Amino acid sequence: IPNIFNQNEISAEIKKNLLNELNLEFNFEKKLHYKFFPRPHFITNELSIIFNDNKISEIKKIKIYVSLNNLFSLKKMKVKDIIIENGNFNLNKNNYNFFIKLLDSNFKDIKFEILNSNIFYRNLQNEVLFVNNIINANYIYDLNESKNILYSKNKIFNLPYSIELFTDKEKKILNSKINLESLRLQIENQFLDGEEFNSGLSRFNFLNLKSIAEYKSNKNYFEFKLFDEAQNSKFSYNGKLNFRPFHSYLYGSANELNFSHLFSNNAIIKQLLKTEILNNTNVDFELNITANKIKNFDNFTNIFLNSKIQEGLIDLD
C-alpha cells in the first residue's frame, strides 16, 4: 500500500501527474494521507496552486483519487479525480484566465471539482474589486461533443447564477451559457480573443424577450451595443465601462418603456436591490434613456430618464 513509500516520492509523483495531465503546479505544505474507502485516494490540508510562476490560491483541503490497479507502483499510478474544498483564488488582469485555461487540460480520464470556494478579483494594487463564490464547479469531458466543459454554480453580490463554459479551439472562440434564475435571465455568449481587442456576441432571453449585444474590450474599457432581435427593432442601447478610472454609462432609445418588467414582484430591479449590489461603493454608473411613451401611461410621452449611481447612492431624475 502507498504507506510503504517515501512521503517525498509520493508527493513528487502526484505533482508530476497533475502537471502532465492538467498543467497545474501544486505545492503541498502538509503530509499526504492515504485512504482506501470509499475508493483509493490521498488527502491533505493546506496547499496552493502556482500559475504563471505566482501563487494564485490557498486551499484548505484536497482529495486526489488514484487508479486502483497500479497502487503498488508509484511510476504507474494515475490520478483519476480531484476534489478541491474551501479554496481562495486570487485573480487579476494578469491571471484572470486561469479557469478558462483549465479547459485546455486533459479531462478525458480525470474529473476536476471545486467546492465551497471563492474567487477574489483584485486590481494591481491587490485591492479586492469583487468576490465570486463557487458553490460547485466541475470540469468534465463530454464524449458526445468531444470537448471539455465547465459546469459551475456560483454566487456574486448575493446573486446566484450558473454557468456552462467551453471553447472552440479551431475558431478560437470561448462559448458560455449563463442562467440567472432569480432574474429569469439567460445569456448565451461567444467571445473571440483578438490581438488588439476582444470582441463577442451575446444573446439575452429575459421574460421571453430576446435581444442581442455586440461588444468589444481591451485592458482599458468594455463597450457594447444592445438591440432587440425583432425585425423592426424597438430599442437600441449603447454602453461603455471604463476601467481607468472605473466608470460606466448606458445611453439608449426605445419606442416604449415597460416599467412593469422593472418593478413587479419578481422584477429585475427588486432582485438587484435584494442582492445589495447597488450599495457597493465601487459602482459608478450613469444612465440616460429616451423613449416615445410609457406602456399603459398614454399621457406620458417624449420621456427622458436620467439616473446616476455613485458611492452607494442612487440619484434618479
Positions of PLM-derived features:
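Short, surface-exposed beta-strand-loop junctions and turns on beta-sheet-rich folds
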Residues: 50, 127, 229-230
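A short, sequence-level motif marking secondary-structure junctions
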Residues: 33, 62-65, 127, 166-171, ...
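Strand-loop-strand
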Residues: 195-198, 202-241, 316-317
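Flexible beta-edge/linker motif
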Residues: 3-7, 11, 32-124, 140, ...
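Elongated, acidic membrane-bridging lipid-handling scaffolds
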Residues: 87-196, 201-208, 266-315
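Short extracytoplasmic/periplasmic juxtamembrane "stem" segments immediately C-terminal to an N-terminal membrane anchor
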Residues: 9-31
